């Protein structure tokens, strides 16, 4: 199964503050994940002050420039892992160095697989989706292929 591991933002991450020791520990941990064959992709995110949010309401789109106030709901970084179970992902996250200089939360969410859409789309479309997914995995440059 594939999971997204989500590091929640904090006041420090939103201020763009990085602790060099925490960064070095995370770098070493990521190397361990890659060597174990767990890590597929991932990166830290810039503070929301450098981003935007698009709100959908029917056919209307409203753009709000960052920063965004509700820090506990924001994401500071993410990783995509391939694990055998949710418990394996939990066990790896427990080994995480704290990604911020403050208390922090890390969320784990399984990714939907093409089979999760059975009953919503036709079997033919499921095959097309699987082909698209394979092409995405095999591409060069930025993307999932960079951690092969």
Regions found by a protein language model. Give the residues of each.
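Conserved, structured core segments of small domains
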Residues: 1-148
């Amino acid at each position: 199964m594939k999971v997204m591991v989500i590091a929640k933002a904090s006041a420090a991450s939103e201020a763009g503050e990085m602790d060099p020791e925490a960064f070095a520990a995370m770098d070493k941990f990521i190397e361990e994940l890659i060597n174990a064959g767990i890590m597929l992709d991932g990166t830290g995110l810039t503070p929301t002050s450098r981003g935007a949010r698009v709100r959908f309401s029917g056919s209307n789109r409203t753009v709000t420039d960052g920063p965004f106030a509700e820090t506990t709901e924001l994401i500071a970084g993410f990783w995509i892992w391939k694990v055998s179970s949710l418990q394996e992902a939990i066990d790896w996250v427990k080994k995480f160095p704290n990604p911020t200089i403050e208390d922090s939360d890390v969320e784990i969410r399984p990714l939907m697989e093409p089979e999760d859409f059975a009953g919503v789309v036709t079997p033919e479309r499921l095959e097309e989706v699987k082909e698209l997914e394979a092409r995405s995995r095999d591409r060069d440059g930025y993307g999932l292929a960079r951690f092969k």
